[in-house]
């Protein structure tokens, strides 16, 4: 069984390139330092997920991602819609700058971002002072874990640890919308 981590221990694990599990708004997530390409590839290998699909970033403050985003290309109305939906269970694909790492964007020209209202996720991102990869804690194609005890045992040996707590109680993972068009990409 993977070790339970405090927030400061989780930050240390992230700094060292580790992958952690933590509860999100609806399901358990896997996370790592988005700046470390090796850590992201480790996470993708654990999930058996294709790298071209792109990944979601969760953060407490949008300014932690300012170098990776090109928000000037959004209309004021679209930007307002995005900003007023946060913090909350809304993931938006925002225009990525040329500095956004390809290992996060995948084969896309946008960056999927959520400013979470989940207390533990927000506290973790604040302690970390950076965004965190947020992808469901499951092998690709399998159902995501809704409780810690539902985490796939095959994932556990690969984790640096688990930040324990309840999920936010949502019935479904967060919606994903395209910030440029407003179209719903995932309900």
Curated annotation (Swiss-Prot):
Gene Ontology biological process terms from the UniProt entry: regulation of translational fidelity; tRNA threonylcarbamoyladenosine modification
EC annotation from Swiss-Prot or TrEMBL: 2.7.7.87
Q: Which residues form the YrdC-like domain?
A: 4-187
The primary location reported for this protein is cytoplasm
Gene3D superfamilies attached here? DHBP synthase
**Where does it reside?**
Cytoplasm
Would you name any one GO CC term? cytoplasm
Does the record bear Chloroplast in its keywords? no
Q: Where are the transmembrane segments?
A: none
User: What catalytic reaction does the record list?
Assistant: L-threonine + hydrogencarbonate + ATP = L-threonylcarbamoyladenylate + diphosphate + H2O
Which terms does the record give in the GO molecular function aspect? ATP binding; double-stranded RNA binding; L-threonylcarbamoyladenylate synthase; tRNA binding
Pfam family of this protein, just one?
Sua5_yciO_yrdC
Give the highest taxon in the source lineage.
Answer: Bacteria
Q: Which SUPFAM superfamilies match?
A: YrdC/RibB (SSF55821)
Keywords, alphabetical: ATP-binding, Cytoplasm, Nucleotide-binding, Nucleotidyltransferase, Transferase, tRNA processing
Q: Hey, which family's this protein in?
A: Belongs to the SUA5 family. TsaC subfamily.
What does this chain do? Answer: Required for the formation of a threonylcarbamoyl group on adenosine at position 37 (t(6)A37) in tRNAs that read codons beginning with adenine. Catalyzes the conversion of L-threonine, HCO(3)(-)/CO(2) and ATP to give threonylcarbamoyl-AMP (TC-AMP) as the acyladenylate intermediate, with the release of diphosphate.
- Name of the featured protein: Threonylcarbamoyl-AMP synthase
State the organism of origin. Answer: Xylella fastidiosa (strain 9a5c)
């Amino acid at each position: 069984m993977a070790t339970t981590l405090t927030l400061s221990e989780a930050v240390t694990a992230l700094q060292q390139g580790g992958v952690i599990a933590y509860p999100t708004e609806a399901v358990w997530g896997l996370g790592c330092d988005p700046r470390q390409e090796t850590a992201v590839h480790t996470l993708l290998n654990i999930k058996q997920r294709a790298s071209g699909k792109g990944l979601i970033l969760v953060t407490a403050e949008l300014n932690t991602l300012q170098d990776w985003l090109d928000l000037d290309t959004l209309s004021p109305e679209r930007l307002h819609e995005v900003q007023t939906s946060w913090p909350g269970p809304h993931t938006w694909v925002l225009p990525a700058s040329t500095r956004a790492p390809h290992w996060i964007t995948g084969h896309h020209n946008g960056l999927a971002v959520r400013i979470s209202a989940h207390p533990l996720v927000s506290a973790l991102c604040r302690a970390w002072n950076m965004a965190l990869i947020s992808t469901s804690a499951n092998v690709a194609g399998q159902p995501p874990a809704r409780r810690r005890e539902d985490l796939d045992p095959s994932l556990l040996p690969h984790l640096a640890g688990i930040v324990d707590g309840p999920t936010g109680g949502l019935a479904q993972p967060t919606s994903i919308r395209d910030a440029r068009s407003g179209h719903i990409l995932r309900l």
